[in-house]
From Swiss-Prot:
Binding site for Mg(2+): D494, D500
SUPFAM superfamilies with a match to the protein in the record: Eukaryotic type KH-domain (KH-domain type I) (SSF54791), Nucleic acid-binding proteins (SSF50249), Polynucleotide phosphorylase/guanosine pentaphosphate synthase (PNPase/GPSI), domain 3 (SSF46915), Ribonuclease PH domain 2-like (SSF55666), Ribosomal protein S5 domain 2-like (SSF54211)
Positions of the UniProt region annotated as Disordered: 747-838
Gene that this polypeptide is encoded by: pnp
Cellular component per GO, a single term: cytosol
Name of this protein: Polyribonucleotide nucleotidyltransferase
Length: 838
């Protein structure tokens, strides 16, 4: 049933397997490539274009489903959505590697889909996907020049050792992350990030990748010979020489005059006029109805014009030794730089190079603003974000704005790679950094203008970069043995040239390199020359930038979020957070600060102003502090009981305000004066390991100040007064029977409605009085309560006299019986007054 073709080879320290004939047999070409546990299904389908076009309608899509790593997608729908940035970047790598290998003039629709089936962190998926796409094209029968292979390259600087297809762990210590693609004869594509490597080290990486890709190209060729069911279709482009030769010398002169315009807007206007005129002439000449009809179609006219125009301009550059706009090969366009031009931005820069302009703006945020990336290679948090925007008005077009496309994502990532190696560590600069590049004008090299503008804006923000970073786009025009390497290319030079070579870096070395080749036969000697010329241009641009701002500002601006850290006991983390995050939310709402708590007890506080940070610190300090007797705290009533109210304070602390400590007057029920959720001020009056006793009546609830709170005079109800004073803080005598006297810290007699009560404080009271129908009995130095009657009064001893060492006067005696008379009163010696409050 299956006609399977399989090829296996050892590549590096892993096994590479290419297989076809089992899966996706309806596709024009389909292969499964496995390398070290990473597997990709690559398919290719081609069909005739529905309408005549003058370009190659090639689409490349790399898809990474979560099943490749044994996961279920997050979110409500549990299904993959739009491609991630990582998938988009891998799709671009494949596209840029295979697009130059289709024959010129080929306009059939081609769709390449690479589906990640399995992922292992030891093997990069882009390597496997490109090999799969190349093999699928090789067996599809679609016109395709030759196989292509790619590899990821790492570099251990201290050892001077290059790594083939490094694992994720190896990349974490590598000074280089490069993807290199080639054919059997030439370099095709390079994408890399480096930690300030020299030109020689980068060239060595290119040569290393070139050598190791060669064996895979041979394997793909052998596999295609075995698996191919039919020979590749031969594409014969239309012979356009007749059309090209018919273009007169007057049009040649008009094109050269138009291209000599230095300003892009004027140049484009003149070129459009010449092209429109020539197109009309050629249509009349070659597409008019005649006997037998024309052998040409409209797109042939377009191809012929492009070929003529490209050949004319390239020859002029090589012959005259000057550029389209009159510059020398290594000359940089005029540069204008301005920083700090947007008042409310955290940092800004306007970088203008010729007719290319980037307005770059920065914003700093807290670690809570970090981007959470949920990818097939694991979840991570990204603290540096760089977004590149290319609106239509940048090139004078009137069209609708659309979400960022592949080009914008790719250019933004290139600029990100250029800046990332010079950023400070999170420990040195814990902010989340976002850079936005708005391309306001474009005439080539807008991604490198973004690099320069981003470096300037970050320094203007106060981000301590290691050094300035500049970028430059290089071009190449090659005809036979003649070639010209162009610095700081225009958009037209990019379109008409053979190479787009972008280099970014510092004075110390290269941080990013991107290269796309359109022709074969570029050797490493030419690349070495291009790297050296790019270095000179990079230094020239950095010098211009340093004249405006050479070092990062000493401090961030006032309206940038401030941040401070404090360390709390790990056991107190729950107190700061509170039930369901209540406490930390309240702190954020009241102060306007943002708070982040780590498991080790580190608390990061972020706020725009110093006052907000200090307020948040004070609130956190209050929560984690141990309560102290005699101190006042803010709290909230959390529970009501018959005997009092429970109040939470200092975060999760809970204490009891006894009913007698709520107010200075009698209350019938706690619910009459308090409700759950009330904000109150409390004084800690006593505490032990498990219980905290609080008082409200001793605090002015409006001001939060402690007040001079004396015991109030109790009212006598159906009873008989029992002397002048009771306890050390009383003024009037305590009552018996139904008299209500607060009990607690103040000692003395304390009676309920049935006449119960007697107490002491710190051993000061020598006896405890009791009320009852019978006579009293002695209770020396104890804190016992005796039986209570309805209204009679009994003294401590039969003599009817009572003494208290801590009172101003002592109570007397009462007769036996329900309506006994007052006993005699004997005043005791006055005792020194103790402090009433903490």
């Amino acid at each position: 049933m299956f006609d399977i073709t399989r090829k296996c080879v050892e590549w590096g320290d892993r096994s590479l397997t290419i297989e076809s004939g089992k899966i996706a047999r309806q596709a024009g070409g389909a292969v499964v490539v496995d390398y070290g546990g990473t597997s990709v299904l690559a398919t290719v389908v081609s069909q005739k274009s529905k309408e005549a076009v003058d370009f190659l309608p090639l689409t490349v899509q790399f898809l990474a489903k979560s099943y490749a790593v044994g996961k279920i997608p997050g979110g409500f729908f549990k299904r993959e959505g739009k491609p991630s940035d990582r998938e988009t970047l891998i799709s671009r790598i494949i596209d840029r590697s295979i697009r130059p290998l289709f024959p010129s003039g080929f306009s059939d629709e081609v769709a390449v889909v690479c589906n990640l089936l399995s992922y292992d962190a030891s093997s990069p998926p882009e390597t496997v996907a490109l090999i799969g796409a190349s093999a699928a094209l090789a067996i599809s029968g679609i016109p395709f020049h030759c196989p292509v292979a790619g590899a990821r390259i790492g570099y251990i600087r201290g050892e001077g050792r290059y790594i083939l297809n490094p694992s994720a762990d190896e990349l974490s210590v590598s000074a280089l992350d490069m993807f290199y693609a080639r054919t059997d004869t030439s370099i095709l594509m390079v994408e890399s990030e480096a930690h300030e490597l020299t030109e020689a080290e980068m060239l060595g990486a290119l040569q290393f990748g070139h050598e190791h890709c060669e064996e895979i190209i041979k394997v793909i060729g052998e596999f295609a010979e075995e698996a191919r069911k039919c020979a590749p279709a031969e594409f014969v482009p239309c012979d356009l020489s007749t059309i090209i030769d018919s273009i007169g010398s007057d049009y040649k002169e008009r094109f050269l005059v138009a291209y000599s315009e230095k300003e892009k807007k004027a140049r484009v206007a003149k070129l459009d006029a010449v092209r429109a005129s020539l197109t009309e002439d050629l249509r009349v000449k070659f597409l008019s109805e005649s006997e037998g009809g024309s052998k040409y179609i409209a797109q042939d006219i377009v191809y012929a014009m492009k070929t003529f125009e490209r050949s004319l301009v390239r020859e002029r550059v090589l012959e005259s030794k000057s550029r389209i706009d009159g510059r020398a090969y290594d000359q940089i366009r005029n540069i204008e730089i301005e920083v700090d031009l947007i008042s409310k931005a955290h940092g800004s820069a306007l970088f203008t190079r010729g007719d290319t302009q980037a307005l770059v703006i920065t914003a700093l945020g807290t670690p809570q603003d970090e981007q959470i990336v949920d990818g097939f290679d694991g979840d991570k948090r990204e603290r540096f974000l760089l977004h590149y925007n290319f609106p239509p008005y940048a090139v004078g077009e009137a069209s609708a704005l659309r979400p960022p496309g592949r080009r914008e994502i790719g250019h933004g990532k290139l600029a990100w790679r250029a800046i990332h190696p010079v950023l400070p560590s999170k420990a040195d600069f814990p902010y989340t950094i976002r850079v936005v590049s708005e391309i306001t004008e474009s005439d080539g090299s807008s991604s490198m203008a973004t690099v320069c503008g981003a470096s300037l804006a970050l320094m203007d923000t106060g981000v301590p970069l290691k050094s300035s970073v500049a970028g430059i786009a290089m071009g190449l025009i090659k005809e036979g043995d003649r070639y010209a390497i162009l610095s700081d290319i225009l958009g037209d030079e990019d379109y008409l040239g053979d190479m787009d070579f972008k280099v970014a870096g510092t004075r110390e070395g290269i941080t990013a390199l991107q290269m796309d080749m359109k022709v074969k036969g570029i050797d490493f000697a030419v690349l070495g020359t291009a790297l050296d010329q790019a270095k000179e241009g990079r230094f020239f641009i950095i010098e211009k930038m340093d004249r405006v701002i050479k070092e990062s500002r000493g401090a961030v601006r006032e309206h940038v979020p401030r941040m401070e850290s404090m360390l709390i006991d790990k056991g107190k983390i729950k107190n700061v957070i509170g039930a369901g995050g209540k406490n930390v939310r309240e702190i954020c709402e009241k102060t306007g600060a943002k708070i982040e708590i780590s498991q080790d007890g580190t608390v990061m506080i972020y706020a725009v102003g110093r006052e907000a940070i200090e307020s948040a610190k004070d609130m956190i300090t209050g929560i984690v502090s141990e309560p102290e007797v005699g101190k006042i705290y803010s709290g909230e009533v959390c529970e009501l009981a018959k005997y009092g109210a429970f109040v939470t304070f200092l975060g999760a602390r809970k204490g009891l305000v006894h009913i007698s400590e709520i107010r200075n007057e009698h209350i019938n029920a706690v619910a009459d004066v308090l409700a759950v959720g009330d904000k109150v001020k409390v004084l800690v009056i006593d505490m032990d390991k498990d219980h905290i006793q609080l008082s409200m009546r001793r605090i002015d609830q409006e001001t939060g100040d402690q007040v001079d709170c004396e015991l109030y005079a109790p009212q006598r109800r159906n009873g008989v007064a029992a002397g002048n004073t009771v306890g050390d803080s009383s003024v009037n005598g305590g009552g018996a029977g139904s008299v209500y006297v607060p009990r607690g810290d103040y000692g003395g007699a304390s009676a309920g409605r049935n006449g119960r009560g007697g107490g002491k404080r710190d051993g000061a009271a020598k006896s405890s009085s009791s009320a009852g129908n019978g006579g009293g009995r002695s209770s020396s130095s104890t804190r016992r309560r005796h039986s209570a009657g309805s209204s009679g009064y009994s003294s401590d001893s039969s003599s009817g006299n009572t003494k208290s060492s801590s009172s101003e006067s002592s109570g007397g005696t009462g007769g036996r019986g329900r309506n006994g008379a007052n006993g005699d009163v004997q005043n005791g010696p006055a005792a020194p007054k103790k402090p009433r409050f903490f």
